[in-house]
Structures are given as structure tokens and as C-alpha cells.
Amino acid sequence: MTIGMIISGHQQTTACTGITLNAGDNARIVARTIEWGGSELNSRYVIVPRGYTQRSYIPGYTLDGMSFTAKYGYVGLSVEQKEFVVEGLNETGLSAGLFYFPGYGQYEEYDASLKDSSITDFQLVSYLLGSCSTTDEVKEAVKKVHVIAIDPRSSTVHWRFADASGRQIVLEIVNGEARFYDNKLGVLTNSPGFEWQMTNLNNYVNLYSGTAEAHKFGDVQLASFGAGSGFLGIPGDVTPPSRFVRAAFFQTTAPKQATAAGTVRQAFQILNNFDIPVGIEFPAGEVHADIPSATQWTTATDMTNKVIYYRTMYDSSIRSIDLNKIDFTKCKYFNAPLDKTKEQPFIPVKTR
């Protein structure tokens, strides 16, 4: 299975939801899901040391694009191939994530004469994590490269970058032009574009946290059926615009937790609401993969304390990778599957 097959085969199965939370101790947490119902993504975590050199794929799936060497060490989570890091954090606290963006982005056409500065969209996260420490540096680095697709059938993607200062930006490439947007809200999903998603929030200006007050409607007394009716009308489907709205409201109404650890746990709790069952994405009776969930993994990244947390469709226990415990000047490149076993463990309860 190749990335081209993944993102061209069934666009309706590709989804991602990202949120941002701030802790009372000033820790910054970015968290996200990644969905794909067509096949197992064979995801891995990778540890990339300083000085490690990679080369980009180009159309035809050959490793003949630009070469890039990591100035900073980083940890990333990949899909399908270890080179395709779609979420990661580097030792300076820069976070980067790739989100599907079908139907709205357009990269420039690949030009073989520019291959030494051409990089595939699925390796851009790796390049920027290894090269940059701030969002301003990300902007400058993107100007120097040509972002291309490996496969002309492929969906495009867009990206979220956040640095230690708290600034977060979104990158979308439309008509071959890189467009950056400040993301003060800290939410990202998929298509349409980020500006449209932010404008669409205005359609839900009537929503609020809490419960609607009882009042008279003529001679009839009306009262809410239950708590939380201030959110009545929030969209509940799994399309990107609906997920964007829900993520925005769930994130902004969540009570601030005192610590980074509490905020990480809160991020996972919020993102529970965005898990996508396999069956709803395809026609009735059509099954594309023997996997337990279309939401294949969820991550929360503590940018301040430099720890990546993740859980998967096979194991909902939360695991962590602490970048502070990695010496990026001495370690070797390493990659391993996110799961050692592909089955949710059951833990017996001692009854006496």
C-alpha cells in the first residue's frame, strides 16, 4: 500500500481533528486524531537525531528529490512508511502536523530541473521539524522549497505548526502558492479551507454553554429537556465543517486544568467525541479493512515539557515519549510500531 493509494482511494475516509489547550501552569498542549478507514496505516514512531540526512521522494516513488539534514532532533509519528511523519515535536518545542485537505489545495507541478529543492507533501513535516524552531522560521523555510505530490491522483494536505511562544499557524498551498494563516483558535480539521471554517463558526453564534432558561411561549410554559441545551443545534456528523465547529466549542468551554498532565488527559477526553466508527464511512455492508476503528490513533503533545502522548485503535492506554530523555546528539535513528500487539488488552479486576 502506498500513500498515493491511501489518499486517492477513498477521500471520504480521511479525517483529522486538531485542538489546542493551555494549562494553568502555562503548558501548551496540541492534540489531534488521524482517521483512515480504508486500511491499516501501519503507523510507527520515529526518533530522528541531529545530523540525520534524508532524501525526498518524487513522482514515480523514487528517492531522488531534495536532501535535507536535521539541525534539530525530533520525534514523529508516521503513516504507511517511516519517512512519512504526519505529527511530531522537535527538541526546541516546535510542533508540526499534517491534515488531509482534499479538493481545495493545488501544489505546483513537479519540475525535474528543480528536484534538488523539491519535497513531497508527506515529508514536509520531517524537513521542517529538523530545520526550524519557530513559526517564522517555518515560513522562511517553505519559501525555499517546492512542495509536490508523489502521485497525481493524491489528495492534497494542509499543515498546522505551533512553537514555544504559543503562536500557531496553518499552511495551505492553493494554485501553487503557499498561504499562511494565524490560528488563534487552535482548531483544525480538513476541507474546505481554514478561512472558510473560521467564517462558518459565525453560523453558530447562538450556541452557548449551559442550559436554556425556561420561559413562556404564549400561555405555554417551555423548559429544556436536559442539561446542555445551550448547545442544541451543534452539528453532530463527521464531516470536516461539523467537526471543526464541535472542536471549537468543546475546546473553548473546557475548564482549564491546573497542570500539563491534567490538560493532556482532558485533551484525550475531548477527542473521544471525534472517534469515527468504521461502518459509517462506506455504503451499507461495504467493509474496506478489518480494523476496529477509522480513528487509528490520537495524540496529545505537551510542547512546553516536550512529551508526546498517544493511544491507538488497538490499545486505548496512553503511552508517552519524553524528548528530554533522548540525547539527540548521540542517539541513532530509530523507528518502531506504535503497538507491539494489535488487540485491546483486558485487565482482570481482582474481586478479593
Locations of regions flagged by a protein language model:
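Surface loops and adjacent helix of pleckstrin homology
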Residues: 33, 173-174, 183, 311-313
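Compact, glycine/acidic-enriched structural inserts
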Residues: 45-63, 105-145, 330-342
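Bacterial N-terminal signal peptides
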Residues: 1-8
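Acidic/His-rich structured neighborhood in mature extracellular/periplasmic domains
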Residues: 87, 92-122, 142-203
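Short, basic/low-complexity N-terminal boundary segments at the transition from targeting/disordered tails
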Residues: 61-74, 131-144, 269-283
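C-terminus-biased signal that marks the final domain/tail of proteins
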Residues: 14-29, 37, 42-43, 141, ...
